[in-house]
Amino acid sequence: MRIGVDKNQLSGSHATSNAPKHRQRPDEVASLEPLRLPYGDYILIDDDVQSVLSTKLEPRKKDLIGHIKRSIDTKKDIPELWMDVTSDHERFKAELIKAKQDGAEFIVLIEDASVECLEDVFFYHRPEVVRSRFVRNKAGRLPAYIKVEHKQREIKGESLYRCMQTISTRYGVRFEFCTRRTAGKRIMELLNDG
């Protein structure tokens, strides 16, 4: 089994957070191949996708459009999903529209142990939190680092649940849930299940 992984999942901060997930698969069962995917994070490299890959030296995102049957987009937790359906909505919506126009099944896999099914999202709640961190003082004066505070907005499960229902109905998206420990195995199951 060959799995295409979006190159962004293998670089930067994603690389360290996704390393445990990528180690969950036995190497003799599945190999990961970095690709530029038009939507989602993981795809199954079947004969149709392989035909595109073998004709191009470095395939671009648009080369794979029309050849992907199922795509999995992973979210590390509920707050990341909340960000995608609120502040980062236009980018997320564009991905969903591309997948729907392409005729691909789009699955959002949320890696959060506090939620097991879509109905559990309704009861999810995270209060508003004020976080602080130290950043380098760009003015060049002392102190070298200054404390910066920012608010993380409250997440109401009821609102998120309604957004997810709308997305599911409008774009044909399927939401799946798992823990971080089982994410790699679950990705393989979802890609094989078709």
Question: What are the residue ranges of the model-derived segments?
Answer:
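Non-catalytic C-terminal interaction segments of nucleic acid-processing enzymes
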Residues: 1-67, 80-194
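Conserved catalytic cores of phosphodiester-cleaving nucleases, focusing on short active-site segments
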Residues: 70-76
